[in-house]
Regions:
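Transmembrane beta-barrel outer-membrane domains
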Residues: 26-34, 82-90, 117, 123-131, ...
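Outer-membrane beta-barrel translocator domains and adjoining extracellular loop/strand segments
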Residues: 6-23, 59-72, 109-126, 150-166
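Outer-membrane beta-barrel transmembrane strands
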Residues: 28, 33-40, 51, 94, ...
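Membrane-embedded beta-strands of outer-membrane beta-barrel proteins
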Residues: 35-37, 93-95, 134-136, 145, ...
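Transmembrane beta-strands of outer-membrane beta-barrel pores
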Residues: 2-6, 43-45, 52-58, 99-101, ...
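Outer-membrane beta-barrel "beta-signal"
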Residues: 136-142, 168-182
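Outer-envelope beta-barrel architecture signal
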Residues: 44-46, 91, 100-102, 132, ...
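Helix-adjacent hinge/juxtasegments
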Residues: 68-101
Length: 182
């Protein structure tokens, strides 16, 4: 599989000592190559399946250096901070509707957004999210070619000190599969 994850996000830092909070927007695009394992069965003309990606898909990362203009501020948060987010062990339940050698597919994703950050005074947790996958593919003997688009739930994380991150992730993927027993 080869894919591209597009993530748009906003970080809103908390209000400190009457100073208005700061908002930072960012967009990240990450390409990935990987694989998955799947099992499927046929039922009433449909193909029903379960697909698991047994690795992390990186959503994005970033670094920033903060400096304060007044050494007398009550919260000195100078220095470099970094953060990274990934989708862990993406699991998809799907159905394919055959149209000759072609098929249309619909899938339901389940995954966890995991964060790894080095911040001044706080940390973010992780969040379970879901998503929908829309696919079109072609079966050719034991090979399957598929193009899919996935739209994930919005991500909303609040740090231990009240900062907030919101993000939206979408995925476009091409997948070549070998179907055993076809």
């Amino acid at each position: 599989m080869y894919g591209k994850v597009e993530t748009d996000g906003t970080e809103t830092e908390r209000t400190v000592s009457g100073v208005t909070s700061e908002t930072t927007n960012a967009s990240k695009s990450e390409n990935y190559i990987g694989g998955s394992v799947f099992a499927e069965t046929e039922y009433a003309g449909f193909t029903l399946g379960l697909d698991v990606v047994p690795f992390k898909i990186k959503l994005g990362d970033g670094k920033r250096t903060d400096t304060t203009s007044d050494a007398n501020e009550s919260t000195q948060e100078d220095g470099t901070v970094s953060a990274e987010a990934s989708l862990d062990y993406l699991t998809t339940i799907y159905a394919h509707y055959p149209i000759g050698d072609w098929y249309a597919g619909l899938g339901y994703h389940m995954t966890k957004v995991t964060t790894d950050e080095k911040l001044h005074t706080s940390s973010y947790g992780n969040q379970d999210i879901n998503g929908l996958q829309y696919a079109i593919g072609k079966n050719s003997g034991s090979l399957r070619y598929e193009l899919s688009y996935s739209d994930f739930d919005d991500i909303s994380l609040t740090s231990s000190n009240g900062d907030k991150i919101t993000a939206d992730a979408d995925n476009l993927m091409f997948k070549l599969s070998y179907v055993y027993g076809q």
